[in-house]
Every structure is written in C-alpha cells, then in structure tokens.
Amino acid sequence: MHCPFCAAVDTKVIDSRLVSDGSQVRRRRQCLDCNERFTTFEVAELVLPRVIKSDEVREPFNEEKLRRGMLKALEKRPVSSDDVETAISHIKSQLRATGEREVPTKMVGNLVMEALKRLDKVAYIRFASVYRSFEDVREFGEEIARLQD
C-alpha cells in the first residue's frame, strides 16, 4: 500500500484487528520511508447478484435504491438509521447467500417487506401498499389483519 504522506511503496502493518461484525479488518500501517503512521480498513469485495426487473431487463443491484425505498416507507417513524443500515446489510447478505448470479426484483421486494415488518409495522404497510399495488381500503384491512395474526 502506498503511503498517503510521501507516496512511498513500502509500508508495514504494525497492528491488525477485526472491527464491526467481523467483516472488516482495521490495520495500522507505518511508512518505511517517512515513518508516518496511518490506518486502513479492509473488507472483502462481495459481488451482489444482478436484479431481473418485471420487464426482464437486468440491472446491477442498487443499494442506494434499496435505501431510498426503505427510508421512504420509514419516513417520520421511530426507527434509527443504524437499524436501517443493519437491515440493509442483512438483505444484502441474504441476496449473496442465494449463490445466484441474478435474482428477480420480487425476491428483493419480499426481503425488504420482511425487514420492514420487523422494524416497524406502519412502514411495512406503507411499503406493501405500493409494492403490492393495493387498489382499495379492503386490501389495506386484509394486510393489517394478517399482521395481527
């Protein structure tokens, strides 16, 4: 790794530790030329499957799109941003665990609904009403009744 201070090529690792949930390694490094110390974080590059939309168009998984959809459903609800980020990480892990190169948007939507159901029931209903295209109040009532079972 190049030194960020003098751009030297030779640096050495002086300390390594697991951080977060064990998915990151924090390394303290020292430049062998200028002796400055700096920290790096190492994470595995894990590829998420492509998403197959309802019109059969394939596109890369878009974490920002997932986040926006969840935050829209959770707007003005008492859910912390840490909880949202944890849910997003869990959804991404579930998608990776499929081992598939491509997954349908329906699978992603169902994972989001499961996560929202755990986080906040009102947000779940908001998301489900758009995702499932509720036509009338009866469909809202049926979904609420299923939540209460």
Swiss-Prot record:
Protein name per the record: Transcriptional repressor NrdR
PROSITE patterns assigned to the protein according to its UniProt record, in alphabetical order: ATP_CONE
Gene, per the UniProt record: nrdR
Function: Negatively regulates transcription of bacterial ribonucleotide reductase nrd genes and operons by binding to NrdR-boxes.
PANTHER family to which the protein is assigned, alphabetical: TRANSCRIPTIONAL REPRESSOR NRDR (PTHR30455:SF2)
GO process annotations (BP): negative regulation of DNA-templated transcription
Tagged with keyword Signal: no
Pfam families in alphabetical order: ATP-cone, Zn_ribbon_NrdR
Cofactor info, note text: Binds 1 zinc ion.
Zinc finger (unnamed): 3-34
Domain (ATP-cone) ranges: 49-139
InterPro entries assigned to the protein according to its UniProt record, in alphabetical order: ATP-cone_dom (IPR005144), NrdR-like_N (IPR055173), RNR_NrdR-like (IPR003796)
Source organism: Yersinia pestis
Keywords, alphabetical: ATP-binding, DNA-binding, Metal-binding, Nucleotide-binding, Repressor, Transcription, Transcription regulation, Zinc, Zinc-finger
Cofactor: Zn(2+)
Single Gene Ontology MF annotation: zinc ion binding
Stated family: Belongs to the NrdR family.
Residues in the signal sequence: none
